[in-house]
Amino acid sequence: MKNCSKYTATQKGRQGVFEAITPEDVATLIYTSGTSGAPKGVMLTHRNLLHQINNMWEIVPAVPGDRFLSMLPPWHAYERSAEYFILTHGTQQIYSSVKYLKADLQKYQPHYVFSVPLVYETLYSSIQRQISSSSPARKTVALALIKISLLYMEAKKIFEGTVLSKNPVKPSSISYMFNCLWARIVAALLWPLHNLANMLVYKKIHSTIGISKAAISGGGSLPMHVDKFFEAIGIKVQNGYGLTETSPAVAARRPFCNVLGTVGHPIKHTEIKIVDIETGEVLPDGSKGIVKIKGPPVMKGYYKNPSATNNALDQEGWFNTGDIGWIAPHHATGPSRKCGGILVLEGRAKDTIVLATGENVEPAELEEIASRSSLIDQIMVIGQDRRRLGAIVVPNNNEALAAAKRKSSLDGNNDEAKDTVMNLLYDELRTWMAGCSFQIGPILVVEEPFTIDNGLMTPTMKIRRDRVAAKYQSEIEALYE
């Protein structure tokens, strides 16, 4: 009886502790990655985390037994949220890393992958290299079929209503009917060739990497050429958006409405608005401004940092993300009828470069375009308070030297080779950025890549601009002399 009384008392004490914990209590502290400043402790509550678990199934309709592969550190907000979702839905989780990703994809054949855009860019590059290394005939056929599949997908989007548009004025009914009819004809004509591509090319890719249901991308913007490629070969990539301060997910593309170039519709019970950068006034759909978030996923505040909390959260509970974006206008009919309310991101407000001329430049847009070059592994655009833009470039040495050797007789490591590579990089930037409003002038070529280990990238593989700029400060100064 004595032991029983002791056990009962202990149980009552535990029950008291359980009852004392409320949904608004802090469940965890997660520190921001500090892309452009010092890390801050984000206080996430039980309500924040439960909102993610309860509302992610609409985006990831997993069933018991599904296999998930992820490779982010478990203390990262994106990975933490994904783990909670996986563990509460009876599914399997496979942990991998960049080093073992290719082998693990083939071995475990996951239904879903949770990762960041850079991983999908790496997969894209790997597939492209495999195609390029095949025989000339196979390479020509594969590239031709991929182009046909891209055209097929573009035609489908017109009559499916998933063509992204910034224009608030809907197209005329007659114009849409004509375009829709033409798109259906084009899709019907291209379907046999697209189906042939599935059998000859895409089936082999699928058997190598799995991802039979969807790849969930978060932590950054997905380059459009990567987005289009995976859709063309039949691998659904659902891009989402969130921050550590928002638990993290606030928007994501749905399986039934996967509009390329966007981060999808808001998660349930989450509000998103776009405000003017200077005045703070709410902007109409289609207008670009600062993205603000309100709702259950928004953090309680920064740990022991009321000043930072007040800067990020206003009195009405709106969180200033610091991101620039716009919301797609609603169209009842037409090729964009399913896009209304979708969020589109266009860079970071605090990453904006202000030139000495007073012009504002979004570096992320230029970096995304420049990184399409096979000669460039990484690039960071610079130019704050300068007369013109510049860039720090980490070249793809194998591709760059191969291109240099094709251009002239080089031994690969002499000064002539370096000069030739430099000239090739300038040519590449001019070619890829020919249609841009801003051009990149001087470039600094560095051999050391930006990585998590050397502190030049965050765990979600975003470049830490402040650290890169500090590391190469003297070289940047010399670049502009």
Where do the language-model regions lie?
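Conserved pre-ATP/AMP-binding loop-to-beta segment of ANL
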Residues: 8-31, 38, 61-67
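Conserved AMP-binding/adenylation subdomain of ANL enzymes
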Residues: 50-67, 74-178, 182-203, 236
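Conserved ATP-binding loop and adjacent catalytic segment of the adenylate-forming AMP-binding
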Residues: 189-195, 202, 207-273, 277-289, ...
